């Protein structure tokens, strides 16, 4: 008697349709861009429970300017982006952008990542579209050679 075939269809859940993503943001002295960074995180059209925002801040020279100088500031940002998880790290030495991106990618929590710069505006579908391209093309990395530059008069 032939064996019964198992149902090979996987159920679609947020976990497999929208995998967990670490949003990686390297920065130094970018405090004026915090409202823009928060707006990007809040308006991504992606399940917020699947996201972690991992910020790496560093020192440059004698200045010690931190994006998140204390627990009170961190809590305020966490409340603004909830339920996105916030992971903030400060390293008290000068680092190149390449060092920061490497550190972030080695220490991220989730299996996928998106590099999100502090002073850029992202369309709301940025994360969903990136995951869609990865799955559709069966590749491990996606990006775009095209950029749109705008110069807002607002001082974020």
Per-region residue spans from a language model:
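Glycine-rich, basic loop-to-helix element that forms the pyrophosphate-binding segment
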Residues: 91-108
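Short beta-strand/loop segment that forms part of the nucleotide-sugar
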Residues: 49-61, 89-91
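Short, acidic, metal-binding catalytic loop of nucleotide-sugar glycosyltransferases
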Residues: 39-50
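Short aromatic/hydrophobic "clamp" motif used to bind/position activated sugar donors
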Residues: 113
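Conserved donor NDP-sugar-binding/catalytic core segment of glycosyltransferases
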Residues: 127-155
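The conserved acidic donor/metal-binding loop of glycosyltransferases
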Residues: 117-121
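Cell-envelope/extracellular polymer assembly enzymes that use nucleotide-activated donors
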Residues: 19-22, 52
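A conserved acidic beta->alpha catalytic loop
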Residues: 55-74
């Amino acid at each position: 008697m032939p064996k019964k075939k198992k149902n090979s269809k996987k159920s679609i859940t947020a976990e497999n349709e929208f995998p967990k993503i670490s949003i990686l943001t390297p920065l130094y002295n970018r405090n004026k861009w915090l409202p823009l960074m928060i707006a990007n995180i809040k308006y991504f059209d992606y399940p917020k429970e699947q996201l972690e925002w991992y910020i790496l801040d560093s020192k440059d020279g004698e200045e010690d300017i931190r994006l998140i100088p204390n627990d009170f500031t961190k809590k305020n940002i966490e409340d603004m982006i909830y339920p996105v998880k916030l992971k903030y790290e400060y390293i008290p030495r000068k680092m190149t952008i390449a060092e920061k991106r490497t550190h972030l990618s080695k220490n991220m929590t989730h299996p996928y990542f998106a590099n999100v710069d502090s002073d850029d505006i992202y369309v709301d579908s940025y994360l969903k579209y990136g995951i869609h391209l990865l799955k559709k093309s069966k590749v491990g990395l996606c990006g775009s050679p095209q950029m749109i530059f705008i110069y807002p008069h607002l001082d974020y």
